[in-house]
């Protein structure tokens, strides 16, 4: 059987997984809790997530901590300047380039986001990266096709 895929969740995807008890992002967290996928985020994502929850839903901070513990979250290290510059050349936005570079350096199999403007609608990202990029639903379809159907 193939190794479990490593998934990077950006802030939008992680927020959706914590905010809603259903939906694709929450399904990814459930897969991680079951140990069939690995989830990582960057320090920037954790910081943004905490700030967003403090502003929009402070009562969910405890839920975030419990979920992150249950899924065995791994923290991607800050990528070196050369990787950051390569990501910046692809995406053009410094904050998003940092997140992209950190996931790239970690060696993820899939980058999950709900950010259409900066990630999903940039075609050059889909061909310029060594990993897939898509929505939670896109990832779940890819996972089913590449891990479930191939092993049944």
What are these regions (language model features)?
Residues 46, 109-110, 116-152:
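Acidic, PIN/NYN-like endoribonuclease modules and their adjacent C-terminal/linker elements
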Residues 8-9, 19-55:
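PIN/NYN-family metal-dependent endoribonuclease catalytic core
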Residues 43, 47-85, 99:
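Domain-scale selection of a single, long terminal region
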Residues 1-5, 150-152:
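Intrinsically disordered, low-complexity and often Lys/Arg-enriched segments
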């Amino acid at each position: 059987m193939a190794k479990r895929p490593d998934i990077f969740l950006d802030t939008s995807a992680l927020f959706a997984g914590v905010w809603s008890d259903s939906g694709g992002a929450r399904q990814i967290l459930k897969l991680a809790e079951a140990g069939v996928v690995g989830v990582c985020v960057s320090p920037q994502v954790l910081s943004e997530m905490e700030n967003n929850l403090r502003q929009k839903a402070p009562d969910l901070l405890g839920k975030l901590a419990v979920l992150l513990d249950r899924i065995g979250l791994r923290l991607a290290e800050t990528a070196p300047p050369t990787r950051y510059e390569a990501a910046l050349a692809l995406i053009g936005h410094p904050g998003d380039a940092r997140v992209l570079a950190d996931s790239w350096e970690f060696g993820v199999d899939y980058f999950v986001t709900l950010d259409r403007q900066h990630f999903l609608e940039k075609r050059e990202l889909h061909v310029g990266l060594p990993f897939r990029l898509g929505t939670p639903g896109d990832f779940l379809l890819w996972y089913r096709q590449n891990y479930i159907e191939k092993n049944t």
